[in-house]
Amino acid sequence: MALRYPMAVGLNKGHKVTKNVGKPRHSRRRGRLTKHTKFVRDMIREVCGFAPYERRAMELLKVSKDKRALKFIKKRVGTHIRAKRKREELSNVLAAMRKAAAKKD
């Protein structure tokens, strides 16, 4: 119990102490991206490019058909959450491409 005032009575009575914060459990890190995994995925993306369904989804996103793109990706990857993550990833790629094109001009 971290105390605000060293008082003898009340909710905050007792000695002033600092809370002992423990490390998070190892099981909590599932799904986190490590530096190595990110590097490998980026390398593969650079070499292989995008899958045909990803290219089509990016075309849909270019013409502001976000909902249609989500439905299309969901059909391909299986679940709604994975589809949302993939759509977000592809829209970030498009934004980066637009930014690079604007910087080049």
UniProtKB/Swiss-Prot annotation:
Gene Ontology biological process terms, A to Z: cytoplasmic translation
Intracellular or extracellular location(s): Cytoplasm, Cytosol; Cytoplasm
GO cellular component, one term: cytosolic large ribosomal subunit
In-chain residues carrying the UniProt-annotated modification N6-acetyllysine: 62
Residue ranges of the TM segments: none
Pfam family, one: Ribosomal_L36e
A GO MF label: structural constituent of ribosome
Keywords, ordered alphabetically: Acetylation, Cytoplasm, Ribonucleoprotein, Ribosomal protein
Keyword Signal recorded: no
Main location: cytoplasm
Protein family according to the UniProt entry: Belongs to the eukaryotic ribosomal protein eL36 family.
Function: Component of the large ribosomal subunit. The ribosome is a large ribonucleoprotein complex responsible for the synthesis of proteins in the cell.
Subunit structure as annotated in this protein's UniProt entry: Component of the large ribosomal subunit.
Record-given protein name: Large ribosomal subunit protein eL36
Species this chain originates from: Bos taurus (Bovine)
